[in-house]
Structure formats: structure tokens, C-alpha cells
Amino acid sequence: MKVSEALAKRKSTRAFLNKTVDVEKIKRILNAAKQAPSGVNTQPWQVAVVMGEKKKLLEQRLENAYRSGIKGQMDYQYYPCEWHEPYKTRRKACGLQLYTALEINRDDKEKQIDQWVANYRAFDAPIMLLFFMDSDMATGSFLDYGMFLQSVMLAA
């Protein structure tokens, strides 16, 4: 498949089959993605592959923390404090499309929470890839990191 085709067919998957994933395939994907460019070859990315009992334990801990009201600390602000156009409209449309597809009503807070918790289970994928970068890396490393992540997705 051409890269342009892969990009055009891109989708966000929020449900996975309970199928075994070949760990060697994951290694091949990550090794291919390591060829992504990075400023002065810093290669700031780190990846943890989590599966089996360790994945179940991590998922349970994350869900328990979330449902207990424990808030994690971000090393950086991901979203703006206040949304402005056109981003506000795009965000709202995306949420509406997702919740409509999942048949979650606006007033059904319990189902909304359950859907959010699915994030912490990696949407039941058999393997979870956790991506890290040292917190002392500068803003430019986010660009390197993004190219690595895109390479992982294209290699997959």
C-alpha cells in the first residue's frame, strides 16, 4: 500500500478483537519506525510494550485511580484552557460523531465515564504500547517524537 493510501484510509479504532499479536511483528514495526528523523539524531522516543497480566494490572490501577477521582499530572498542557474557532467546532463535531456511533446520550454520564475508562484499557487491545520521552527534552523533540509515532503507524 502506498503511503498516500494509508493516510487516506486512516481511522481511529476503539474496539479490538481478543487475538494474539505476534510480538516479533511489534518489534519489526518499532525497529522500522526508529529510522524516523530526529534533530542531531537524538531519537528521544522510548517505548514500553505491555501485555498479559502486567497489562491487566496496569489497566486496573489506571481505572481505579480515575474512578477514585485521582488526577494525573501532565508534564505539559495538551489542550488549550479555552477553545476557539475553528477548533471548538471541530472538537464538538468529533465528540458528537463518536457518542452518536456508540449510542451514548448527552445526559448519560455513566456511559460517558465508561467510554473514557476504555482509554485506560487501550480499548481492549491485546497489547498496549506506551510512549515516553525524557521530560528534560526541549520542544523541538516533540516534532521528532511525532515523526516517530507517525512512522510506527505507517509501519503497522
Give the ranges of each region predicted by the language model:
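Acidic, surface-exposed loops and disordered segments
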Residues: 1-156
